[in-house]
Amino acid sequence: MLPLTMTVLILLLLPTGQAAPKDGVTRPDSEVQHQLLPNPFQPGQEQLGLLQSYLKGLGRTEVQLEHLSREQVLLYLFALHDYDQSGQLDGLELLSMLTAALAPGAANSPTTNPVILIVDKVLETQDLNGDGLMTPAELINFPGVALRHVEPGEPLAPSPQEPQAVGRQSLLAKSPLRQETQEAPGPREEAKGQVEARRESLDPVQEPGGQAEADGDVPGPRGEAEGQAEAKGDAPGPRGEAGGQAEAEGDAPGPRGEAGGQAEAEGDAPGPRGEAGGQAEARENGEEAKELPGETLESKNTQNDFEVHIVQVENDEI
């Protein structure tokens, strides 16, 4: 009974022992796999030769691969493996390209494909926006290559935005529109100029002179009365006939002669109108002008005196 039990146990444990994993040289760890398969997108003559040999194996004889640069080779590979023509390579397209270039024999066993680690490494280092897709710019620009030749103590080159900003400020300073806005007076200066102009216009020395000039140019009630008197003297009427009779009679004394003499004497002698005219001339020459209400009262009094004198002359002629 015991040998039978031992035989059954041996038969049950034998397949399990043969199927258990074993250590061997045919199964390297992940670190060894990563070292054996470098990133072909990294700059270097060895990686470039690897990609060129892959393209030669494809039979692309229309392109001279020896004269292509690294950027041109990568763009050529990108165009070959962008199957959906989206302008981006996803993980499967990267896996297909790297498997065909690095390990063609591992394409039939995806579970043991060592290129998967390379795809993960490429997406980790070169996928800058982290969307899981590779653009041509991300494929060509390997991170850390541009700063490799720069020493730590060496200052970096200034950004191109700084000279543009300086040039823009100089153009703004030289622009005629900015100069006009700088030269144009502001609202405070205009208001200040208006206040000074009003002060000059309200100067008490200049205001009477301006009123005197206005009085001299604009005909007032005195000028209208004198014009009416001249018109009456020229037009034929009872006064004109009386004046003609007075001249015909000569120097004979009479009431009409006395009236004509008085009229001529009033023409020669200064009267109220002459005094008013002298006052107006004195105002125009620079004397101090009187206030406007007093001047209007004086003109009214002069007009009344002139009308009374005309009535007296008519009564004398009649």
Curated annotation (Swiss-Prot):
Single GO molecular function: calcium ion binding
Residues that hold Ca(2+) 2 according to the record: D127, N129, D131, E138
Keyword Transferase: no
Primary residence: secreted
Function: Mediates cell-cell adhesion in a calcium-dependent manner. Able to inhibit growth in several cell lines.
Residues annotated as signal peptide: 1-19
Source organism of the structure: Homo sapiens (Human)
Residues in Sequence repeats: 219-235, 236-252, 253-269, 270-286
Low complexity biased stretches: 235-272
Posttranslational mods: Probably digested extracellularly by an unknown serine protease generating extremely hydrophobic bioactive peptides.
Disordered: region residues: 177-318
InterPro entries named in the record: EF-hand-dom_pair (IPR011992), EF_Hand_1_Ca_BS (IPR018247), EF_hand_dom (IPR002048), ER-Golgi_Adhesion_Reg (IPR052110)
Annotated ranges, domain EF-hand: 69-104, 114-149
Protein residues bound to Ca(2+) 1: D82, D84, S86, Q88, E93
Inducing stimuli: By p53/TP53.
GO CC list: extracellular region
GO biological process per UniProt: cell adhesion; negative regulation of cell population proliferation; regulation of cell cycle
Keyword field: Calcium, Cell adhesion, Cell cycle, Growth arrest, Metal-binding, Repeat, Secreted, Signal
Subcellular location: Secreted
Chain positions covered by the region annotation 4 X 17 AA approximate tandem repeats of P-G-P-R-G-E-A-G-G-Q-A-E-A-[KR]-G-D-A: 219-286
Protein name: Cell growth regulator with EF hand domain protein 1
Lineage: Eukaryota, Metazoa, Chordata, Craniata, Vertebrata
Free-text note regarding domains: Both EF-hands are required for function.
Compositionally skewed regions (Basic and acidic residues) per UniProt: 186-202, 223-233, 281-293
